[in-house]
């Protein structure tokens, strides 16, 4: 656990050297942290991918933002959608039961928090998922 925390800190420091905004998603805690200019400015609870459809770990960038996105796979609304590296998953408003339950996306359970996160997060923001 200490190694994972150290890795996140080192990765975050490297990303901060390149960008003024970064998101860290802690899968174990089901939490999202938004940093701007090395300061924590936003925290929210999440629901990430369930056991057989996990949210992929790694480092990504926000490459697309859509206020009123509809999934082309599941044909459901995904308000305040932010796609990661052109992949078929992203961060968006959605049902949050308090545990991993999605098909891989990162769900923010409050519409107002999803809106705030969307507004605070520019294209190109780095996202670390671990």
Model-derived regions, located:
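Protein maturation boundaries and topogenic segments
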Residues: 2-3, 18
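Structural motif
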Residues: 1-2, 24, 119
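Intrinsically disordered, low-complexity
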Residues: 15-61, 126-130
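Exported/periplasmic cell-wall-interacting domains
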Residues: 19-20, 50-59, 66-130
């Amino acid at each position: 656990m200490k190694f994972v925390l150290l890795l996140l800190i080192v990765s975050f420091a490297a990303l901060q050297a390149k960008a003024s905004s970064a998101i860290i998603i802690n899968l174990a805690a089901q939490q999202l942290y938004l940093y701007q200019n090395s300061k924590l400015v936003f925290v929210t609870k999440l629901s990430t991918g369930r056991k057989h459809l996990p949210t992929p770990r790694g480092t990504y960038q926000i490459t697309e933002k859509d206020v009123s996105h509809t999934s082309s796979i599941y044909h459901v609304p995904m308000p305040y959608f932010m796609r990661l590296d052109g992949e078929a998953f992203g961060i968006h408003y959605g049902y949050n039961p308090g545990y991993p339950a999605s098909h891989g996306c990162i769900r923010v359970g409050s519409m107002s928090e999803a809106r705030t996160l969307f507004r605070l997060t520019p294209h190109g923001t780095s996202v670390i998922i671990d």
